[in-house]
C-alpha cells in the first residue's frame, strides 16, 4: 500500500530523492569500476556499455524515473538535479576523452566536453532502449530482430562510438 511509504519517508519528495540517490550510487559504482579496471578509453567504453545494458534491465524502474525527470513532468526537480544527476558522468567522460586526446588515442580535436555530451546521449538512448517500453519498441523498429541480441547491440554501439571519436585502431 502507498501508505506504507509514509511510515519510512516523510513525504513522496523524500521517497523520490532517496530512490534517486540510490540510482546515482549504482551509476557511480559502474563508472568507478569501468575506470579502475580498464586500461584506456576503449576498455572503459566496453565496460560501461556492458554494464549499462545489464543494469538497464535489472534496474529498469530507476531508468523510468530518470526518463520521467527528463521528460518535463518533474520540472520542479529537473533544474536542481541536473548537476547532481549528470555531473558524475559528465566529469568522468570529459576526463577520459581529454586523456585519450592527449595520448593520441583519439584524433578528433573537438572539445572534450562536447564529445562527452554526445557520448552520454548515445549511452542514455541505449539505457532507455533496454528499460522503457517506448524506447524498446523504437529499438525494435530500427533494428528488427537484432534488438534481441545484446552482444550485437553492444558491439555495434561500441564500434559507432569508436568511429565517432576517431579512435585509432587497436595495435
Annotate each PLM feature.
Residues 12, 19, 23, 27, ...:
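Hydrophobic/aromatic residues within well-ordered alpha-helical segments
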Residues 2-7, 27, 41, 59-66, ...:
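Gram-positive cell-envelope targeting signals
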Residues 34, 38, 63-73, 130-138:
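Secondary-structure edge/capping motif, primarily at the C-terminal ends of alpha-helices
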Residues 1-14, 18:
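Helix-turn-helix
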Residues 18, 22, 32-61, 112-119:
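Hydrophobic alpha-helical connector segments
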Residues 53-92, 114-116, 144-147:
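Short secondary-structure transition hinges
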Residues 54, 87-103, 121-171:
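C-terminal peripheral helix-coil segments that are non-catalytic and often amphipathic
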